[in-house]
Structure formats: C-alpha cells, structure tokens
Regions:
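A structural signal for multi-pass alpha-helical bundles of membrane permease subunits
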Residues: 1-175
C-alpha cells in the first residue's frame, strides 16, 4: 500500500514539474533543471543523516514547537515517504522529471495552441489534451517508481525503523 501511494504521489508531482520545465519559461529555468539532474547523480546516502534528523525532529516554521513545546517524530510512519514524494524529493524523482520533460517536449505545441483557441485554460489543456497523450510515459515512470519503492531497503530502514516489510525481510535473508 505504501509503495502504491508513494508511486501515485511521485508521478502526480513529477508530471506537473516535468510539464512546467517542458512548456513554460521562468527565471533560472536552466539552473533549476540542472538541480533536478544533480539529484539523479547524488546518491541518497549522502543526505541520509540530514533526512533522518529532519524527520526525527519535524517542525514546519517552528509551529509545532511553539504550540506543543516539542517537534514531531515522523519516523516509524509512511509520512516521510509521502512528504518527499509530493515535493519531488523522493527516490529517483529527478529521473522521472527528466523522462517526463523529454516526453512533453516531443508533443507538438500546436495541440496546446488549438486548445487555448477553443477556450481551455492552462490546467484544462494539461488535463484534457496533454495528459491523455502522456499515458505511455506515465505508466513507464509509475512502474519504475513502484518497483524501486517496493524493493528499497535503504529508505525503509531509515524512515520506518523496525517495521516488518517484505523488502526488509528479503534483505536479511540475502545476508
């Protein structure tokens, strides 16, 4: 269930970001896309200690600490997976954004222009014209995401701790 939910969140977020990179001009677009590509290159082990501390002492703008006196411990729950996936920081999200962006750059802009002429907004054009064409890449990225989440032991041990999961049990059998 966790793998399915995380995969759906990853694909939803990465599709919006990939479409934005493919179709819109905004300041520092090349810089932000380079930052996305760098996330593919950097191994997750390099940021594991900061992720562990961030989700062990979770606090947004000091709100929880100001109201309750302590921060939230999100370890031991699937919430860190959901937060990372929804904000495009999850496992292999840079790769999915790159793949989806490349697919969207191959779709002719005349399809979008025709939808704009017919009175569609940007979001309606994305939803009714672009997304139906993008089903092949979305299915491919979903399958990649699901399999990587299902077989991931690193993030499972980091975020979930001692919870029994099939991927964690399989890794102990291999040892």
């Amino acid at each position: 269930i966790v793998s399915l939910a995380v995969s759906v969140l990853q694909i939803a977020a990465c599709t919006l970001v990939g479409y934005g990179f493919a179709r819109f001009e905004f300041p520092f677009k090349k810089f932000w896309f380079a930052a996305v590509i760098i996330t593919v290159i950097i191994p997750p082990q390099t940021i594991s200690s900061s992720l562990y501390l961030h989700f062990n002492f979770f606090d947004i703008f000091g709100i929880f600490k100001a109201t309750t006196g302590s921060s939230l411990n999100l370890r031991g729950s699937p919430i860190p997976y959901a937060l990372m996936s929804a904000t495009c920081m999850g496992l292999k999200n840079g790769l999915y954004i790159y793949m989806i962006r490349q697919f969207f750059t191959g779709i002719p802009k005349s399809l979008e222009e025709a939808a704009y002429v017919d009175g569609c907004s940007i979001f309606k054009t994305f939803w009714r014209v672009i997304l139906p064409d993008a089903v092949p890449i979305l299915v491919s990225c979903f399958l990649f995401s699901f399999v990587w989440q299902w077989t991931d032991t690193f993030y499972s041990k980091l975020f979930l701790g001692n919870i029994k999961l099939l991927s964690l049990e399989a890794s102990t059998v291999a040892d």
